[in-house]
A protein has these predicted regions:
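Conserved structured catalytic cores and adjacent interaction surfaces
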Residues: 42-43, 50-53, 58-115, 122
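Glycine-/small-residue-rich beta-strand-loop submotif within the FAD-binding core of flavoenzymes
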Residues: 88-100, 134-155
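Glycine-rich phosphate-binding active-site loops on the catalytic face of alpha/beta enzymes
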Residues: 122-140
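Flexible, glycine-rich loop/tail regions that form catalytic "lids" or insertion modules at the edges
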Residues: 1-47, 54-58, 62-65, 111, ...
């Protein structure tokens, strides 16, 4: 009763898995979806601060499963980079002594490679729903570019990602995904010390580099390129 646990077979969630979690009505669990998108004329730093405010509000309201979602991106809204959002919120929850009371799930179109998932789990995510990958798989199946059932193809992808994460963890002497979560066993290269100290606290970083403003500019450039190309289609 005092230690209820939601168990999933794979930390890489299908769209159906996440839908079930969002709709869950089980005593002891309360789910809250927190957007990690922001208006494009807002600074990235303010957007992250707003994420902290929303997480604190959800915690006060009794939520113990936070789903960080970048769904809703449009021509006026850009996403906080998923790893930055996850790690920043992880550090905020640790500093405010809330981390052990809250699980963090990411719903994002950004992660697609094993390293993406490995870093997201390593910096605090408990599970990840790569919805854009699954939408892409569906399109490939529908266009007969993939000779496989959609659900089987998604399952194969999820298992391949999980096997890759397990391989990374095992090289570090970690035997379970649960032990790997939040372990921060990575070294950062090319990120400014202020960004590391504030959002990736205690991560080893011997070489400085891009600032938060540089990251914001990159996000805006990618967003503009995506929507300009759509306008010209």
């Amino acid at each position: 009763e005092n230690c209820q646990v939601l168990k999933v077979n794979n930390p890489i969630l299908t769209n159906t898995d996440l839908m079930k979690i969002k709709a869950m009505k089980v005593p002891g669990f309360k789910v809250e979806v927190i957007p990690i998108i922001y208006y494009k004329n807002t600074s990235l730093e303010k957007a992250i601060d707003r994420l902290f405010v929303e997480a604190d509000r959800a915690y006060r309201d009794g939520a113990n499963i936070l789903i960080l979602s970048d769904r809703g991106i449009d021509e006026n809204h850009v996403p906080i980079p998923s790893l930055l959002a996850v790690s920043a919120l992880q550090q905020h929850l640790v500093r405010t002594k809330k981390r052990t009371s809250v699980a963090m799930i990411l719903e994002s179109g950004e992660p697609r490679e094993v390293h993406h998932f490995a870093t997201l789990l390593g910096y605090g995510a408990c599970a990840i729903n790569p919805y854009l990958v699954q939408d892409t798989v569906k399109q490939l199946v529908d266009e007969h570019m993939l000779d496989k059932d959609y659900y089987a193809a998604v399952q194969d992808y999820n298992n391949a990602i999980l096997n890759g994460i397990v391989k990374i963890a095992s090289k570090m002497g970690i035997s379970t995904i649960q032990s790997y979560e939040g372990s921060k066993i990575f070294e950062a290269i090319g990120i400014d010390k202020n960004v590391i100290d504030k959002y990736f606290t205690n991560t080893v970083s011997r070489i400085g580099g891009i600032t938060l403003k540089d990251i914001e500019n990159d996000v805006n450039e990618l967003h503009s390129a995506a929507y300009l190309s759509l306008i010209h289609i």
